[in-house]
Amino acid sequence: MTSAPLAARLRDVAGPLFFPVTAFGPDGAVDLAVFRAHVRAGIDAGAAAVFACCGTGEFHALTPEEFRLAVGAAVEESAGQVPVLAGAGYGTALAVQYARAAEEAGADGLLAMPPYLVVADQQGLLHHYAALAAATGLETIVYQRDNAVFTPETVVALARTPGVIGLKDGHGDLDLMQRIVSAVRTHRPGGDFLYFNGLPTAELTGPAYRGIGVTLYSSAVFAFAPDIALAFYRALDSGDDALVDGLLDHFYRPLVELRAQGRGYAVSLVKAGVRLQGLDVGEVRTPLTEPTAAHVKDLIEIIASGRALLAEHAAAGGGA
């Protein structure tokens, strides 16, 4: 656990937010040694924060004990260099148990995922996240997606909830996000509520989200191609439009189109990408399935295209 307040550390980040995959061995058990290597490699590559056991990390497929061990391993590998956040989800009672396990394991904060299966009204969602935030001393980011999509008024209430520091948007409705940002700015002036672009390949919509003031984003690509993810992050931050557009056109858009070819590819393609870089993190757990051989070949070509573009950009004097 780091000493500085989480919100302040995340507000001042200078790199992508890293969502590691959870490694499984040939027997299907969590491989903590490989997971540690994956987390350490990401931190060494320039991750600004680690979000362990979240969507990309197959939170849904982990037992409470596996979750506790993996979060603890991520905390140990971070050693205070960057904040570590952990996923927490399902119904309120179980989400609280995961949150307390994350706190005991030394995490700095929580990513609160949507409640399991149920479709609740806005008041019910607010009560759920307020109870989760009150259950520990960890600061909480609420994940908007699927069955947890909020009105601007609800987000204003969340922003006033002790312990809730931000909203990660995985819904992708820019009109709604603009109204949310405006409502919180109006009704909680001077506040420091954080917003994150949390779409599956957030870089594709990075320029659009920056237009409404959302500069923080999760990077699934960072898990398997940190060089490309960092180059894009720096180009977007510095206004290198040529590199941003090149990577969007020749890497990120093809990747998103490939991701759309199979259910669960937002996770299984990332895991395949990590394996392609030489770290055997195993396969995804059921009910997710592995990408087809043809799609893995496509992924190899997309990664090669992205790296070729970086090499051309560097050769032209643009840096990387």
UniProtKB/Swiss-Prot annotation:
<dbReference type="InterPro" id="IPR013785">
    <property type="entry name" value="Aldolase_TIM"/>
</dbReference>
<keyword id="KW-0456">Lyase</keyword>
<dbReference type="Pfam" id="PF00701">
    <property type="entry name" value="DHDPS"/>
</dbReference>
<dbReference type="InterPro" id="IPR002220">
    <property type="entry name" value="DapA-like"/>
</dbReference>
<dbReference type="GO" id="GO:0008840">
    <property type="term" value="F:4-hydroxy-tetrahydrodipicolinate synthase activity"/>
</dbReference>
<comment type="similarity">
    <text>Belongs to the DapA family.</text>
</comment>
<dbReference type="InterPro" id="IPR017655">
    <property type="entry name" value="Dehydro-deoxyglucarate_dehyd"/>
</dbReference>
<dbReference type="GO" id="GO:0047448">
    <property type="term" value="F:5-dehydro-4-deoxyglucarate dehydratase activity"/>
</dbReference>
<comment type="pathway">
    <text>Carbohydrate acid metabolism; D-glucarate degradation; 2,5-dioxopentanoate from D-glucarate: step 2/2.</text>
</comment>
<dbReference type="GO" id="GO:0042838">
    <property type="term" value="P:D-glucarate catabolic process"/>
</dbReference>
<protein>
    <recommendedName>
        <fullName>Probable 5-dehydro-4-deoxyglucarate dehydratase</fullName>
        <ecNumber>4.2.1.41</ecNumber>
    </recommendedName>
</protein>
